[in-house]
Amino acid sequence: DADLIRAAAAEAGRCAVVGGGFIGVEVAASLRALGVEVDLLMIEERVLEGPLGRALGERLTALLRDRGVRVHPRAEVTAFHGESELVSVAARGAPAIQVPVAVVGAGIAPATELAEAAGLQTDLGGIACDQAFRTSVPDVFAAGDVAAVWSPLAGRRLRVEHWAEALNQGKLAARSMLDMEAAYDRVPYFFSDVFDSSIEYVGFGGPVEDEIAVERDGGMMAYHLSGDRLTGVAKLDVDDDLQRARELLRAG
């Protein structure tokens, strides 16, 4: 898919990208680095504000614009126009974008219909599990993007849409199926690169209720809080391995 997108966008010279999350931002930055004219449409005010918070969202939105990406915030895509080929993208809150290529990275919703029909409890839009990936129905397990797994560290269920989590959870779920010791006790972590900037995050996700952003070494650290509890730490272009952040998150 990546090869096809790169080839089509490079040949066309212009591309619309729908979505202000990690997929949309990474695609927009990668295509712009290849010299493609890019329009990024998103319903949010700032890119990646959901997982990273307002401060880093503002910094990354400015970075994209500085590098030539046309960012259209609060733009809800309503239609793709064209017959045999794409001609334009229409959006509420933005002018029509004349492009021959579009990439949609607007997120997914887990398909839980079968689970619900089988009587499985759901939560956070996915299948509810305990710490050992057991669902509410005996001998049925769930892992990966669809699983809302109980985290004793967070004190709530987490549904993390990331390949590293899916890989780890699958191994633990298999151990649980075999009646071997298996307990979800991870602090989720992910990283991304946007142009030559590096992003890392460690924490439990969810809405950022409050944040403290600190300029550091030309980059930024953002500490996410819920009341007086640390729930996540995000960093942009800062040399920090986040080990201390992990320790604080584990300590609650």
Predicted stretch roles:
Residues D1-A12, S84-V89, A96-L172:
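FAD-site-proximal beta/loop scaffold in flavoenzymes
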Residues D1-L34:
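Glycine-rich dinucleotide-binding loop and its adjacent helix/turn
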Residues A9, G13, A174-E181, L249:
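Short, hydrophobic alpha-helical segments
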Residues L34-C129:
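A Rossmann-like FAD-binding core segment of flavoenzymes
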Residues V146-D241:
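Mid-to-C-terminal Rossmann-like scaffold of FAD/NAD(P)H-dependent oxidoreductases
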Residues D239-G252:
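A short, polar/charged loop-to-alpha-helix boundary motif
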